Amino acid sequence: MKYFEKRFLDVYRPIYLGVIFLGIVLDLVTKFLVILYFQPHRYLEVFGSFFRMTLTFNTGFVFGAFQDNAIPSLIATGVAIVFLIGYRWKNHDLGNPWGWNLVMAGAFGNFLDKFFVKIPGTGFRFGFQPNMGEYIGVVDFLDFDWPDFLLFSRWPAFNVADSCVTIGLTILIFTMKLEEEK
């Protein structure tokens, strides 16, 4: 018995690959624009103090945990992407494909972003090198203030790729739960 019952393009149809590509492009373009027009840790209020755009760099993992661990973060993200591709291919009928597409777009967007050195005012330069007055890490810029009853006053800044992963996982959790109940 073959491990993968379906061909790759039967599971990852061209329309799905197009959505993944579109998500990656949207993520990287927004990050590029923020790099060009914002200075690190200076913000622009969009909806008062509730929603601001603030350029930050995450050199760690989720929510900025374990900062200055760019290489382990890059490796972990790469392993997760390979796992997700294989898992989705093997379990092609599990969950909503659009949820998978969004998770993949976000994972690839942040993975690619980890390979670029960011230079405020000039944009991106390809290469993974030590920080020499430049910025290495994932660009985060969507900055929300939440009610004071939460453990922190501002949610950690995030980006379009993070939004894709969150929305995609939410879709997958709900659709898998519905499939389980049937």
Curated annotation (Swiss-Prot):
Q: What is this enzyme's EC?
A: 3.4.23.36
List the active site: 140, 162
Query: Where does the protein end up?
Result: Cell inner membrane
Task: Look up keyword Membrane and say if it applies.
Answer: yes
Record's signal peptide: none
Q: Which reaction does it catalyse?
A: Release of signal peptides from bacterial membrane prolipoproteins. Hydrolyzes -Xaa-Yaa-Zaa-|-(S,diacylglyceryl)Cys-, in which Xaa is hydrophobic (preferably Leu), and Yaa (Ala or Ser) and Zaa (Gly or Ala) have small, neutral side chains
Which EC class, in a word? hydrolase
Question: Keywords assigned by UniProt?
Answer: Aspartyl protease, Cell inner membrane, Cell membrane, Hydrolase, Membrane, Protease, Transmembrane, Transmembrane helix
One Pfam family, short name:
Peptidase_A8
Concerning InterPro entries, the annotation shows: Peptidase_A8 (IPR001872)
List, in alphabetical order, the Gene Ontology terms for molecular function in this entry.
Answer: aspartic-type endopeptidase activity; endopeptidase activity
| Residues annotated as transmembrane | 15-35, 44-64, 65-85, 97-117, 155-175
Q: In which pathway does it act?
A: Protein modification; lipoprotein biosynthesis (signal peptide cleavage)
Instruction: Describe the task this protein carries out.
Output: This protein specifically catalyzes the removal of signal peptides from prolipoproteins.
Give the family per the record: Belongs to the peptidase A8 family.
Stored PANTHER family:
LIPOPROTEIN SIGNAL PEPTIDASE
- Could you identify this protein by its name? Lipoprotein signal peptidase
